Regions:
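Helix-turn-helix
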Residues: 25, 29, 33-67, 71
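Amphipathic alpha-helical linker/stalk segments
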Residues: 70-97, 128, 134
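Short acidic/histidine-centered micro-motifs embedded in hydrophobic/aromatic stretches
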Residues: 75, 111-115, 162, 166
Length: 219
C-alpha cells in the first residue's frame, strides 16, 4: 500500500484529513492566485501555501496546473449560471443583473483579462467546453429573435458580444470608466446610475412591441 504523507500547514501542524475541505481550500487559493497573476504567472507553490497543503497533495487532487485552472473556470461558470437561475431574458433586467454581478465578482473579470493578455494566441483552456456554452447562448438569442422578443436585424453574435461588453467593460477597464465619468467604478452611485442606464438602453435590443420572455444570455 502506497504511503502518502499528510499535508503540513505553514506553521508545521498536520492538516486535517478531509478531502472535500482540502479541495475547497485548493480551489479558493487557486482562484486568488490565478486572478492576481494569470495562468502563466501563477505559482503552484503559492497556491499550495494558500491552501495550507504541500505541492504533492495539490498534484494528487488536480494533476497539474492546467487541470486546476480548468476546474477554477468550470466552478466560476457554474456559480454564475446558478446565480442567474430564473433570470428573465428581458435585457432591461438581464443587463443590469450581469453588470452588478461583475461588480461583485472582480476575480472573474481578472481571470478573463489575464487570459487575454497571456493566452490570446494559444488555444483556450477548456476551449471546446466554453465554446459549446457560447453556442448555446447564441441559440437562445436566435430563438428569441425568431419569436419576436429581440430585434431580428441584429447579428446574434454581435448582439451577444455587445451585451457582454456593456456589462463587463467598466470593471475590466476601471481607469477608462473613471476618466469618462469622473467616478470610480467602486462608487455605489456610479454602479446605481450605470445599472439604470443599462435598463433604459436595453430597449435598443428589443423588437417593436418589446415583448418579454425568459432566457439567460450568460454562457
Amino acid at each position: 500500500m502506497e504511503y502518502m504523507a499528510r499535508p503540513v500547514k505553514p506553521n508545521g501542524a498536520v492538516a486535517e484529513r478531509n478531502p472535500e475541505r482540502t479541495r475547497e481550500r485548493i480551489l479558493s487559493a487557486a482562484l486568488q492566485e490565478f486572478a492576481a497573476n494569470g495562468f502563466a504567472g501563477a505559482r503552484v507553490d503559492a497556491i499550495a501555501r494558500g491552501a495550507a497543503i504541500n505541492k504533492r497533495m495539490l498534484y494528487h487532487y488536480f494533476g497539474n496546473k492546467e487541470h486546476l485552472f480548468r476546474e477554477v473556470l468550470r466552478r466560476k461558470i457554474t456559480e454564475r449560471q446558478a446565480s442567474a437561475e430564473g433570470l428573465s431574458g428581458d435585457p432591461a433586467e438581464s443587463l443590469p443583473f450581469w453588470f452588478k454581478l461583475s461588480c461583485r465578482d472582480a476575480d472573474w473579470v481578472r481571470l478573463l483579462e489575464w487570459e487575454a493578455l497571456q493566452e490570446a494566441d494559444n488555444p483556450l483552456i477548456d476551449g471546446a467546453g466554453r465554446r459549446a456554452l457560447a453556442i448555446r447562448a447564441l441559440g437562445r438569442i436566435r430563438q428569441q429573435q425568431a419569436l419576436g422578443y429581440l430585434a431580428g436585424e441584429f447579428e446574434p453574435r454581435h448582439l451577444l458580444l455587445a451585451m457582454r461588453s456593456l456589462t463587463m467593460f467598466p470593471m475590466a477597464f476601471p481607469q477608462l470608466a473613471r476618466l469618462i465619468t469622473g467616478q470610480p467604478v467602486s462608487n455605489p452611485h456610479f454602479q446605481k446610475k450605470y445599472a439604470e442606464f443599462l435598463k433604459k438602453f436595453a430597449a435598443a435590443f428589443q423588437s417593436a412591441g418589446g415583448r418579454r420572455n425568459k432566457t439567460n444570455f450568460e454562457n
